[in-house]
Amino acid sequence: MHIDIIETLPSLARLEDNWNAVYDADDEAQIFLSWKWLHGWLSSIPGPWFILAAKERDDADLPYAAFFPLRLQTMIEKSDVFSDVRMAGNFGADYTGIVCRPEAEHKAIPAFARIVRQMNWARLHLDNVRISERRWRLLTACFPKASFHSTKVDKIIKVDGIDNSLCPYATLPNDWNAYLDALSTNTRQKIRRLLKQVESSSEYRITVATAETFDRNLETLLGFWETKWRARKSDRMDSLIRSNRAMLTRSFHSGLVYLPTFWHGDRPVAALATLIEPRKRTFSFYMTGRDETFEGPPAGMILHAYSIRDAIARGFVEYDFLRGNEPYKYSFGCKERRIHSVVLETRSGRNPGGRIDHRCIPDVLQQATELHRKGQSADAEIGYRRILEVEPKHADALHRLGQLLAAKGDFAAAKRQFRILTTVRPDAAKAWQCLGQVCESLGQYEEALRQNLEFMRLQPNQPDGFVAVAKCMAKLGRMAEVNAALLAAIEPASVSSVRKRRDWRPTPDRQTAGEHAVSA
């Protein structure tokens, strides 16, 4: 198989038709792998992502047969840089996985695994992967125990014992009464009674969000949800609210959200957000919230029953409760599927060869710069050096590493970074200024003079350049020239005089010439 790597939204946009064709052909595909949902999600997440795309051979006219969406996260910790490869949908999707034509899976999935194995990462998080056992074996067989530690992630919530690796779902017939007949007598009677109570009464009503009401209905839902879970998720609540609001809003505008609200008079007492996937004809219950002070009929059961009835009327074939085996879900006639969560780690616990993936460079630079600002110089230095191992002429890493080295007194090493920087960015005045400063710190005044003159040439209106040149000339015993330059600067014709000083290049004497030869 030939594998391409898709890394930009425009490239992904061009693949929409190809993606949808593969998605439609794949019985294992689900909404979190749909082009609409994934494109929206990838447009919003920080950090690099990429999609492995497989085709039979390297032919521009040949469509892809499989896609594997992934993302990269990098951390500077324990005196090194560690990269994690994660499933692209993690932190927003209940399910992750691979989209693949069934006839291509035996070639495409092992090819994906081989490509991932060759990348520079310390940990591979195969988290919340909804995939058949057959495909799971094809994927994981390329990561043998001799080379990788494999750790199964425990998805059982300790507080209440809910197992988030178990995912209940109800298969929907084409008739509402047929669905009810498959439930227990008690549940069937309860659902009929509750829906009748709501629909035959002026006291209660259910509305479904429209373009005009969606924002208000969503805020109602999120407010209820926050009240319920704030104490338990306090440290993450604000980010979860922001993420859920953004994802559901994007998805609604793509036609992927169904949001009914249950009302008692003019008081909203519960709301439920479901992701709908017309291509696969599935409803996927995402989140709910209710007014905990409401003492009327059970709002959760009413909204689920209402949603399932509507899904059947629309011709949908599955109502998925997503992750978590909460007992109430099974009263709706559910089966369950199990998803996989495993972390694969290199035996060394580090990136192979200690190198970072080039896609991580912006993240590593940001983290290293923040560590540098906080005074954590050792970790910051590691970050800068890892960048330069991959991209030796990275201007920002050269500059910041040079500054860090100079600050800790390693002027010779700092000089090497700034000298490279002046070749990478010869038009950057700051690079010449920094090079001049470290040369001064090394006592190499003739060389410092040359760098400072170049700084003056690039920034003629900056007094710092004139001061630096004057200091070097004074150190070299050329006070007469400094005095002449000062007099020229205050004469009416000072502009041309300063230009003469700026363009002047001293001829090094024998001692400074030798010094320059040693320091180069």
Q: Which residues does each PLM region occupy?
A:
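A conserved beta-strand-loop-helix scaffold within acyl/acetyltransferase catalytic domains
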Residues: H2-V85, N128-F148, D154-E295
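Register position in tetratricopeptide repeats
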Residues: R373, A407-K408, S441-L442, K475
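TPR alpha-solenoid repeat register
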Residues: A397, A431, G465, V498-R499
